[in-house]
């Protein structure tokens, strides 16, 4: 029987037909043997033709398969030899055993057989060793996606040059939105006559229009102090390469009576949604203004932010009206809360503790229980004397609690006030930030990309000398029943004195007003000086660090111990060394680099204002203020930290350090 008849689908019906035919023949033989004989002959003929048809079908199928196999073999050969896909076989020593003509033509060679991968495509060898499955590499000015089959020692090369060019073109042409804000327009133009104000407006508009025309930017003025700019990613790259020189140009050419206009620019990029672009641009502008203005902030969808500019000391812009409004808003929030928990940053300083005590008085003035969170394991030598003095006042010391106690007493109506920092990673106890919903942030540092989530109230003034100064102003507008005793006023004054280096840095008229208010409340300046005293041992140790100071770029002092003199330094001691260096002649900025423990290298940075050390420290994952900043680096040596520091300084002077 033909082979396909053996399949059940065909076999059973045929068996049934044959059985039926045999029965029919038998019946015919019974009645008429001649008819039976004829039927037998007919059945034999039918079976013969079925067999013959099966044979013909099998021959046709075999012929078709043979033709198809030949065609497939031909296609395979042509694919190997003619298709624009590179194929390469190599041996254990990374020598090429075979390569198709397309791949040879990519290297402008007639054949690659016998050549080493190190000579022809060296960048592929590390991928093979690293067990990478697929990667894009550059060979002879073209881009290839290499697929690696290690078991067969086979490489496929897909030319993706045009695809990458199209992707690059798409990226370059994506829309970018920028909001431009004249930081101090009202301050500069107030008091000017109409003609002078009009001249200044024309000058600013002319500068910005010329800048926009040079780079092909659409620019529209939306108000006296606001502009909107539309550009693309390619233009943004050019602006980044120029370090946004328009900032310096506007500042230099709009000076009036020693006061110049400055720009803040918020840029939204790398998304296709216009709404998201607008949100990113506004968020970037808020960030630039929160950091003191005179700078550009570029915020990307992944949360990363790049900064340009911000090298000048920001002008004092806050007013007593704003302080009064914030104070009243804080009073309302405190009144609606069940209790108040105040928290500063890790390893608190005088400013952090002084400001926390000030907010404690705000809570008490509004008849609410207030508590200050402090970790006994994080009390540094710089505040030990202050804490020791506070312990003499039981009523005040009883308000200090540990992070664990704070977690226990917090509830849904608790208010958390964070002072002297705005970064969740730096607070005394991050669990409180995650647990408590109602949060207020009071800080004087420039705003960074990391920020407390959804605060009810934010009072950030980078123009202030210290957080203690901001809190002192808030105290002045609290209910009259507020009473501040000597130790509380002294703690606030100590915070101001430490952050201003005894009123020598970042000191404005409002700083002296706050100090005067605290002195009137009984602040003891002699006690403050006792807080600031140091031991002979710490003085000698600090001198040892300063002894190995070198000058970099003529006016930058860098102090660090040689690698062969491994020694651990307290963070406060490192900061004091940087302060001491700043008092040297011809030193504009100082950096003290030392190991705090086995894993951590600390860098403290100080400046007189000409050099923005905050930007330099941000490049090293740190932060701070224009004249006072620091960072901590883990897992590196002091010499490696010095190299990274010098690289950040070089980038700063070349036109702006970015993150």
UniProtKB/Swiss-Prot annotation:
EC identifiers of the protein: 3.1.4.59
GO cellular component annotations of the record: plasma membrane
Regulation: Phosphodiesterase (PDE) inhibited by Zn(2+), Ca(2+) inhibits in the presence of Mg(2+) but not Mn(2+); c-di-AMP PDE activity is competitively inhibited by ppGpp. Heme binding (by Fe(2+) or Fe(3+) heme) inhibits PDE, activity is partially restored by KCN or NO only for Fe(2+) heme. Binding of NO to Fe(2+) heme switches from hexa- to pentacoordination. Heme binding inhibits the ATPase activity.
Induction: Probably transcribed under control of the sigma A factor (sigA), protein levels are negatively regulated by an antisense RNA.
Entry cofactors: heme b; Mg(2+); Mn(2+)
Region annotation (DHHA1 domain) ranges: 591-646
Cofactor note: Binds 1 heme (probably heme b) per subunit, probably hexa-coordinated, which inhibits PDE and ATPase. The Fe(2+) binds CN(-), CO and NO. ATPase activity (residues 84-303) prefers Mg(2+) over Mn(2+).
Compartments where found: Cell membrane
UniProt topological domain (Cytoplasmic) ranges: 1-8, 51-659
Gene Ontology biological process terms in this record: sporulation resulting in formation of a cellular spore
Annotated family: Belongs to the GdpP/PdeA phosphodiesterase family.
Domain notes: Has a GGDEF domain (residues 173-310) preceded by a PAS-like domain (residues 84-149) which together have ATPase activity, followed by a region with a DHH (339-496) and a DHHA1 (591-646) domain. The combined GGDEF, DHH and DHHA1 domains have c-di-AMP phosphodiesterase activity (residues 150-659) that is 10-fold enhanced by inclusion of the PAS-like domain (84-149); PDE activity may only require the DHH/DHHA1 domains. The PAS-like domain is important for heme b-binding.
Listed name of the protein: Cyclic-di-AMP phosphodiesterase GdpP
Organismal lineage: Bacteria, Bacillati, Bacillota, Bacilli, Bacillales
Gene field: gdpP
């Amino acid at each position: 029987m033909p082979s396909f008849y053996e399949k059940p689908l065909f076999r059973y019906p045929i068996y049934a037909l044959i059985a039926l035919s045999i029965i029919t023949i038998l019946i015919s033989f019974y009645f008429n043997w001649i008819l039976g004989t004829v039927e037998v002959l007919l059945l034999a003929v039918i079976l013969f033709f079925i067999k013959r048809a099966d044979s013909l079908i099998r021959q046709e199928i075999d012929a078709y398969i043979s033709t198809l196999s030949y065609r497939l073999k031909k296609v395979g050969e042509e694919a190997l030899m003619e298709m624009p896909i590179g194929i390469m076989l190599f041996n254990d020593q990374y020598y090429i055993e075979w390569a198709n003509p397309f791949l040879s033509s990519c290297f402008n060679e007639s054949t690659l057989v016998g050549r080493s991968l190190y000579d022809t495509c060296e960048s592929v060898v590390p991928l093979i060793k690293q067990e990478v499955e697929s990667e894009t590499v550059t060979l002879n000015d073209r881009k290839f996606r290499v697929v690696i089959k290690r078991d067969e020692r086979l490489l496929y090369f897909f030319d993706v040059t045009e695809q990458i060019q199209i992707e690059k073109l798409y990226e370059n042409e994506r829309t970018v939105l920028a909001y431009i804000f004249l930081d101090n327009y009202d301050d500069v133009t107030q008091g000017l006559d109409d003609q002078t104000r009009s001249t200044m407006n024309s000058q600013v508009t002319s500068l910005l229009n010329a800048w926009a025309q040079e780079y092909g930017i659409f620019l529209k003025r939306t108000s006296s102090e606001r502009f909107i700019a539309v550009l693309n990613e390619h233009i943004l790259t050019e602006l980044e390469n120029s370090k946004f020189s328009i900032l310096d140009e506007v500042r230099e050419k709009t000076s009036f009576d020693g006061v110049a206009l400055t720009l803040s620019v918020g840029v939204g990029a790398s998304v296709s949604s216009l709404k998201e672009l607008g949100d990113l641009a506004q968020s970037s502008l808020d960030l630039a203004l929160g950091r003191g203005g005179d700078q550009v902030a570029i915020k990307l969808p992944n949360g990363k932010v790049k900064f340009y500019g911000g090298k000048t000391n920001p002008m004092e812009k806050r007013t007593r009206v704003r302080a009064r409004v914030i104070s009243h808003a804080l009073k309302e929030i405190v009144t609606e809360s069940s209790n108040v928990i105040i928290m500063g940053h890790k390893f608190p300083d005088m400013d952090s503790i002084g400001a926390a005590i000030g907010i404690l008085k705000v809570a008490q003035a509004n008849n609410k229980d207030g508590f200050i969170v402090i970790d006994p394991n994080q009390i540094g030598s710089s505040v030990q004397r202050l804490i020791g003095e506070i312990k003499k006042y039981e009523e005040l010391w009883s308000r200090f609690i540990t992070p664990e106690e704070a977690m226990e007493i917090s509830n849904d109506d608790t208010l958390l006030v964070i002072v002297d920092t705005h970064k969740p990673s730096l607070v005394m106890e991050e669990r409180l930030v995650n647990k408590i919903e109602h949060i207020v942030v009071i800080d004087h540092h420039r705003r960074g990309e990391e920020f407390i989530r959804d605060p009810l109230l934010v009072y950030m003034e980078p123009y202030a000398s210290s957080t203690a100064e901001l809190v002192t102003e808030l105290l002045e507008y609290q209910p009259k029943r507020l009473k501040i005793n000597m130790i509380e006023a002294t703690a606030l004054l100590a915070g101001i004195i430490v952050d201003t280096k005894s009123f020598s840095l970042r000191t404005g008229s409002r700083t002296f007003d706050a100090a005067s208010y605290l002195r009137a409340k009984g602040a003891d300046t002699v006690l403050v000086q006792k807080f600031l005293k140091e031991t002979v041992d710490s003085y000698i140790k600090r001198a040892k660090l300063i002894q190995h100071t070198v000058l970099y770029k003529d006016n930058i002092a860098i102090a660090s111990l040689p690698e062969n003199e491994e020694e651990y330094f307290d963070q406060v001691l490192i900061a004091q060394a940087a302060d001491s260096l700043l008092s040297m002649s011809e030193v504009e900025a100082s950096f003290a680099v030392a190991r705090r423990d086995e894993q951590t290298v600390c860098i403290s940075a100080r400046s007189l204002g000409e050099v923005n050390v905050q930007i330099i420290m941000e490049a090293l994952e740190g932060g701070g203020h224009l004249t006072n900043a620091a960072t901590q680096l883990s897992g590196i040596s002091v010499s490696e930290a010095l190299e990274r520091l010098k690289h950040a300084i070089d980038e700063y002077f070349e036109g702006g350090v970015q993150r």
